[in-house]
Amino acid sequence: MSLASDKKDADVASTTTTAQDDDNLSTYHGFDHHVQDQVRQLARTLTQQSSLHQKKEHTLPEEGINPIFTNTEADDYNPRLDPTSDEFSSAEWVQNMSNISNSDPDYYKPYSLGCYWKDLVATGESADIEYQANFLNGPYKGLKTVYNTVVPSTASSKDKNFKILKSMEGAVNPGELLVVLGRPGSGCTTLLKSISSNTHGFNIAKESTISYSGMTPNDIRKHFRGEVVYNAEADIHLPHLTVYQTLLTVARLKTPQNRLKGIDRETYARHLTEVAMATFGLSHTRNTKVGNDLVRGVSGGERKRVSIAEVSICGSKFQCWDNATRGLDSATALEFIRALKVQASISNAAATVAIYQCSQDAYDLFDKVCVLYDGYQIYFGPAGKAKEYFQKMGYVSPERQTTADFLTAVTSPSERIINQDYINRGIFVPQTPKEMWEYWRASEDHADLIKEIDSKLSDNYDANLAEIKDAHVARQSKRARPSSPYTVSYGMQIKYLLIRNFWRIKQSSGVTLFMVIGNSSMAFILGSMFYKVMKHNTTSTFYFRGAAMFFAVLFNAFSSLLEIFSLFEARPITEKHRTYSLYHPSADAFASILSEVPAKLITAVCFNIIYYFLVNFRRNGGVFFFYFLINIVAVFAMSHLFRCVGSVSKTLSAAMVPASMLLLGLSMYSGFAIPRTKILGWSKWIWYINPLAYLFESLMINEFHDRKFPCSQYIPSGSVYNNVPADSRICSSVGAIRGNDYVLGDDFLRESYSYLHKHKWRGFGIGLAYVIFFLVLYLILCEYNEGAKQKGEILVFPQNIVRRMKKERKLKNVSSDNDVEIGDVSDISDKKILADSSDESEESGANIGLSQSEAIFHWRNLCYDVQIKKETRRILNNVDGWVKPGTLTALMGASGAGKTTLLDCLAERVTMGVITGEVSVDGKQRDDSFARSIGYCQQQDLHLKTSTVRESLRFSAYLRQPADVSIEEKNQYVEDVIKILEMEQYADAVVGVPGEGLNVEQRKRLTIGVELAAKPKLLVFLDEPTSGLDSQTAWSICQLMKKLANHGQAILCTIHQPSAILMQEFDRLLFLQRGGKTVYFGDLGDGCKTMIDYFESHGSHKCPPDANPAEWMLEVVGAAPGSHANQDYHEVWRNSDEYQKVQEELEWMSNELPKKNTNNSETVHKEFATGVLYQCKLVSLRLFQQYWRSPDYLWSKFFLTIFNNIFIGFTFFKADRSLQGLQNQMLAVFMFTVIFNPLLQQYLPSFVQQRDLYEARERPSRTFSWKAFIVSQILVEIPWNILAGTVAFVIYYYAIGFYSNASVAHQLHERGALFWLFSCAFYVYIGSLALFCISFNQVAEAAANMASLMFTLSLSFCGVLVTPNGMPRFWIFMYRVSPLTYLIDGMLSTGVANVAIKCSNYELLRFSPAANLTCGEYLGPYLQTVKTGYIVDPSATDTCELCPYSHTNDFLSSVSSKYSRRWRNWGIFICYIAFNYIAGIFLYWLARVPKKSGKLAKK
């Protein structure tokens, strides 16, 4: 079977199919790159199922033959069974496999599965209306949600729950196809999920019965999950895998034990993959990446085929397809359904398909149909009887309306036609969902259905159940548990997933290479930073040795932090494959870990070898390998920990908060920043549970044990003390013993950290235990954590609007048209709403002053050329046309004909290539104001999710209507637009995101509304306004366009194969064939008669009276799949009388229209309607409102700020003025900056969302300039960062105790104010660097990596880890250019300066004075030389106690910090912020502002 003929397929040339047998019946040969040819073959071959069986009996032996051929020259070779042959026929292959299975039932164990349900009721939590969370109510709303989850509600279950599906019944027997029809929101998706046992997010009532030929949904979920499969709309795949790799993995995981005799597992899997690719037209894409929205790969249509091929390989007996034909035209959708029919007939499988736009030919293939209306089942039965059933009910089917469209139109009050005869005769016609449901339940068809279901449910299925179980066990591999739903064993799952993961790594090897090179570079940079101070193995290296070791363990441990990103990419795929019973999620998790081991080892080897030897750690083989072993344990322990965090989090942003908190806690309590002996009592437990603490301890013992470090500095020192006895001076290092000229490493560790050598291997053992513990925990979480549950669509309103609506008692009448929120609406209110809406639609637009187009827009000989691989390709070829006020013009053509390209050229939206020809407005060239004088409704509905409908419309009106129009007039005009678009019910609803906000139709109306609110004076372009919509919504959008045209608006609209009824709404048609060539431009006429007459008069076959004129025309010109034109209709057009008339009209327009009087004022021709300052004001207000209504973003910013600063503040709580206290205060300032990464990563996605919306919609329509966009981003972010900086200051400054230093120095106010300025400046700096990095980067991850690198380098060279005096001369420039140098210097000096130091008892150096001297006399010369330090008791003669420092300013000098530079430092840091913002603005202009527009080339 084939799927959509997409843009890639469109370029494939078709060849004529010839009959290949005596029955003049062409055989279906599968799919290779000639997709269209094959579509036609399949369509012609499989129309009659009996013919198919007849054909098979003539060509295949009853017992079947082995289809895996090793020799194509052998006598038994059948090319129709060989997927690599051009003659391959998938239908014959399926029949052959069925024959083989039936020939040996004891081995292959064939079986079948049907599905029967009775009294099926689905319920969801009542939430049809929500108030919008904002910065103030966000925490309350979140706590209320948690409370409601934890504490059972006292409300009745009726209040809490509502029925999504009301009581319904159904039966799908083996070999049958069921189509489910209904408008969006009717419950189609919920029904499919219910009968496929995928009920996340809603509940099935206890009284409901669902039977799968005797099995319960619980049996399916636990033991036979793979037999019942639900295929969702979205096509989610691993983007970097090729099509072949994606499908081969599925085939390997589904290869049965009872496969073809004599064929090994791998050969069978490869054959199955080849068959699937040949069947679905994917053979030519085998080595192409599947891709996604960001990764370039196969086309959208081909990706849809990959999804279908996956399900096909799974071989499920009951398949549920949710809108699987979305985005496919009717011809290719037909082929998909035909192939489903063949599969059902031959393999005895059953399928249920929910479909939105269903052609008559497709409908006729279904055995049964189920019609849903707002959760009510209003018909279930034979597809052939449904139309008659509703006609009997009292509804009329218009001429040329398909049966499927008629059945869904019955559920739409605005579209259904009630039989006038019934009304005249007073016969009751059911109209509300409940009335139709009651009519259905009283009908004979319902009674027949109940009889069928009861007979099926009462059947004895014991034999059938045993058959299914035997078949399942026979398919399972040897080591698989019989009760397991999976086909292959756990070990084989890991093996195949490991292969898949290695493919992924190979396909994206650039990432691994970047990590290796990046980490190696960091090893060189960091290692060389310590090179000078670690050159000599003396006591002077003690601090730096600890710092370097701390850096090593942190860098290795946190190198796995970014693994969280990849977890979220793969999660939906794993969840999908779990429902297909391909593998355990834990098997995928374990394979993922194993596959990354080589990359981790290579990265660790490259980093650690370079770093270890450059830093000059201990040169000993055993010591090095122990160092490497400990760091490898750190890598895996943290990798598994971060994976655990990711697996319990619903979203990436939710995972980053705990990950950031862990990062801070683990690093601060590792033993370096604050030694274990100095940790405050209440927080010691953090050290005991911290794996990094034990690993750091082992590394330090490994480095220092059994070493003598020569003393680098003695106290006292100087020429006066050269001849004093050894016990009269001491080494200045901790651990020194009086009289020794060295310090033992073990003594230093014991005194400084309380580390003992006997604990060396303890760290390794505990680290390994953590690795195993986190691994097991991660696998358990992956296996049993269901991930984010899907929500139904709900309308969201701002809280003040909700209050007002409650007062007006409107809430019960407001409902979003969707699947999971339509609750029980009383019959009366339902009728009232129907009546109200019909009254409003009658009145709406009667007296509305919509903008009327006055000018005629016309183009002549329009050509568009682009360079592709050094060749010039013509996309549009001499296209002519016009759009007049009050007309609705359709633009049609096959995929790849250039429809959207023509719109973009006419609207000046192309940024590459060369456009030639004439494009004129009333005979004059387009001016700068043209882009804002038109409305352009894109195919994607792009809106700001936090705005309401009314706010979105007003924003467009304020900025795009002329500045001289008053605000009152603009507001009134917006109200007019709301009325004509019939959006009054949800005018104050928040746009939201799909699922929580407006539904598809409402979004499409808003898209049109935003363009109308701009009051376009020329015309409105609409690109595919009906794509992805059901036929009823498409109809309502088309009616809306007609209404606009009737109000004098000029409209040009591209449309993809409209229905006959839709087609009749248009006035004119411009039809393009492939290559951008015109085939027809002219009136359509009543019932498209003018257009039909044109083609019939120029040699086409007659249009059948019941045919869709659009499909007939596509077939005539050879644009439908498999069709061929009997002549070149472009040449026919160029030689026709109609073409000459078009040329004459265009000539008249060019000559006469310029004579019209037009407004030539300067404001009319400006690029933007309003000034830059006004734009900045409005855009900033909107952005501020967005921030206010995004509590997740703001509260995570403040939560992180509060947590980080409380954590740091209470770790170093009220640090004293001892040496350790000063060290702690310096490290506290250093740790203050680690919030940089988490805050930056939160901001970047927010900016990217804003920018994408601006560049896709607001910039092309000239709503506001790029200057207003970028300046508003800066202006709105700064106040929130200042607020966060203020919160940080209040917590941090007082907790650490900086205020007490200022108080003692009598500088409380100045130093407090300056510290607050530094704190705010740092938070603003984070925002400025984020803007600088993202301004020119396309994706947030790239900007985050760049900013993280810059921050790491700034932090490394800021002077804390290594003082500038200790750095190699080469790196001094880095110290000077690092912005954190000035921040930390300023904060530290402001925090601790001008106070006396008081050493703790253990920090005092003790030694004996020279004979007959007091300590004061003995140390006097030394203290005068060093100018710091104090003696505890100068008069002592026995033991001198000396504190090395006497004043905090002396300590500051030792770390190159000075209090006198405090204001200079703040000023320099502010300059860095200004530089970041200015550079960000410049880089945005340089990289992302278009320097040319799609203007016409000068001739």
Swiss-Prot record:
ATP binds at G893, A894, S895, G896, A897, G898, K899, T900. This is Pleiotropic ABC efflux transporter of multiple drugs CDR1. Induction: Azole exposure induced expression 4- to 12-fold via regulation by the transcription factor PDR1 that stimulates gene expression via binding to elements called pleiotropic drug response elements (PDREs). Expression is highly up-regulated in azole-resistant isolates. Loss of mitochondrial functions leads to increased expression. Expression is temporary increased during the intermediate phase of biofilm development. Expression is down-regulated by the transcription factor STB5. Inhibited by clorgyline. Inhibited by RC21v3, a 4-methoxy-2,3,6-trimethylbenzenesulphonyl derivative of the D-octapeptide D-FFKWQRRR, via the interaction with the ectodomain. FK506, enniatin, milbemycin alpha-11, and milbemycin beta-9 also inhibit CDR1 activity. Inhibited by milbemycin A3/A4 oxim derivatives. Residues 1-29 are annotated as: Disordered. Disruption phenotype: Leads to susceptibility to the antifungal azole derivatives in azole-resistant clinical isolates. Suppresses the development of high-frequency azole resistance (HFAR) in a medium containing fluconazole. One of its GO terms (molecular function) is ABC-type xenobiotic transporter activity. One of its GO terms (biological process) is intracellular monoatomic cation homeostasis. The modification Phosphoserine is found at S307, S484.
